[in-house]
């Protein structure tokens, strides 16, 4: 495995952020800035696209590629015996679900926002085919990170179905309030039911972290740091 790429900002308990799409953290500056008021925010760039890797050859990705890379990041930034909070959005939400399945001991609480595990839905294969076709049709001339996502991330990640039960209080599966009635809202509900995680609504839609960064960040903070335990220590 190559050295993982990540950026660190803020202070407080560690919050690992895994972006969606191809993992490029573009546009996440405002939400991470807000989160950095309460957390040491570690933003993982699984393909190194924001660290000079854009334009380099990319192999087809699997959730395990990203989750094991995220685990390597945690091994670098956490002291022995510590655990981290985790936030993943969209494809990053799938990666953090897989991270929780593989390495629960390093994780305090995981928030997976609209992970597109659409195969959990009735007619899951059909739902996945329509989702993939719709995204590709709408981004036929995509370049940069979106092109990488469509070519190497979209199909393998949407085939992922979580097959674990989360310990109580360790997983929140979120969907945007503006996504009600849409396939990814229903998917988030199904993921919560499958894993035993809590379900929560967050501000905005699928891109709530970009559309409403302050409100989204505050909802993350409320979820991870309940008001009766602000700045809870990171112990397992």
Task: Give the ranges of each region predicted by the language model.
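Conserved HGGG/HGGXW glycine-rich cap/lid loop of the alpha/beta-hydrolase fold
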Residues: 1-53
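Short beta-to-alpha linker loops that shape the active-site pocket of alpha/beta-hydrolase fold enzymes
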Residues: 45-49, 116, 203-205
């Amino acid at each position: 495995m190559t050295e993982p790429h990540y950026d660190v900002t803020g202070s407080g308990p560690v919050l690992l952020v895994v972006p969606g799409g191809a993992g490029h953290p573009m546009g996440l500056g405002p939400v991470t800035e807000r989160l950095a008021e309460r957390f040491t925010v570690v933003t993982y760039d699984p393909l190194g696209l924001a660290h000079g890797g854009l334009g380099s050859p990319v192999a087809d990705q699997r959730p395990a590629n990203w989750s094991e890379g995220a685990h390597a990041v945690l091994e670098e930034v956490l002291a022995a015996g510590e655990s981290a909070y985790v936030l993943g959005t969209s494809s990053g939400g799938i990666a953090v679900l897989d991270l929780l399945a593989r390495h629960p001991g390093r994780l305090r609480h995981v928030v997976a926002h609209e992970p597109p595990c659409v195969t959990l839905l009735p007619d899951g294969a059909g739902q996945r085919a329509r989702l993939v076709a719709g995204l590709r049709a709408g981004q036929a001339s995509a370049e940069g990170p979106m092109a990488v996502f469509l070519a190497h991330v979209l199909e393998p990640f949407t085939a992922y179905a979580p097959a674990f039960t989360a310990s109580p209080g360790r997983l929140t599966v979120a969907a945007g309030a503006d996504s009600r009635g849409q396939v990814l809202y229903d998917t988030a509900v199904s993921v919560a039911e499958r894993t035993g995680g809590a379900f929560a609504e967050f501000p905005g839609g699928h891109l709530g972290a970009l559309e409403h960064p302050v409100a989204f960040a505050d909802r993350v903070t409320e979820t991870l740091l309940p008001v009766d335990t602000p700045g809870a220590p990171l112990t397992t």
